[in-house]
Amino acid sequence: MTDNLTRAFKELLNQERFGSQSEIVDALKKQGFTGINQSKISRMLSKFGAVRTRNTKMEMVYCLPNELSVPNTSSPLKNLVLDVDHNAMLIVIKTTPGAAQLIARLLDSIGKSEGILGTIAGDDTIFVTPTNDKPIDELLQNIQRLFENTL
């Protein structure tokens, strides 16, 4: 992938007006790039962590959030977790987009011995259910301590 293609691709996504991969293909072809197809665009979207979101006109479009990057196992947890809150029944963890499943897998691996009965993860939100034998405040503190560590 050339630097020019990467730059043009990112510039197009920053315009927040492309709702389909075929629209991105067409726009890049109009700029003179050859060999561009939907499959290549799909790989580029994944590589750069693009997400579909609503723009200011409430249209679903692809974009590259500047402040976000695709999380991986070497990312410090404190950089991926945005907020941890709870009520009497659940702990809710808000993460950067794409990080919830990675963090939920880590929490599940800690397991019942540390007071975690299970997790449910979406793209950027995790529900943590505590076991009956661990006070939720204690589990919350353990989870917050875990997020302060860098793995």
Swiss-Prot record:
User: What processes in GO biological process is this protein linked to?
Assistant: L-arginine biosynthetic process; protein complex oligomerization; regulation of arginine biosynthetic process
Q: Does the keyword Signal apply?
A: no
What SUPFAM superfamilies does this protein's entry cite? C-terminal domain of arginine repressor, Winged helix' DNA-binding domain
Please give the pathway this protein is involved in: Amino-acid biosynthesis; L-arginine biosynthesis [regulation]
Question: Which Gene3D superfamilies did the record assign?
Answer: 3.30.1360.40, Winged helix-like DNA-binding domain superfamily/Winged helix DNA-binding domain
Q: What is its main location?
A: cytoplasm
Leader sequence segment = none
Query: What InterPro entries does this protein's entry cite?
Result: Arg_repress (IPR001669), Arg_repress_C (IPR020899), Arg_repress_C_sf (IPR036251), Arg_repress_DNA-bd (IPR020900), WH-like_DNA-bd_sf (IPR036388), WH_DNA-bd_sf (IPR036390)
Looking at the keywords, is Amino-acid biosynthesis present?
Answer: yes
Q: Name one GO cellular component term.
A: cytoplasm
Keywords of the record, alphabetical order, are: Amino-acid biosynthesis, Arginine biosynthesis, Cytoplasm, DNA-binding, Repressor, Transcription, Transcription regulation
Q: Where in the cell is it found?
A: Cytoplasm
**HAMAP family linked:** Arg_repressor (MF_00173)
* Family of the protein in this entry: Belongs to the ArgR family.
Q: Its biological function?
A: Regulates arginine biosynthesis genes.
Descriptive protein name? Arginine repressor
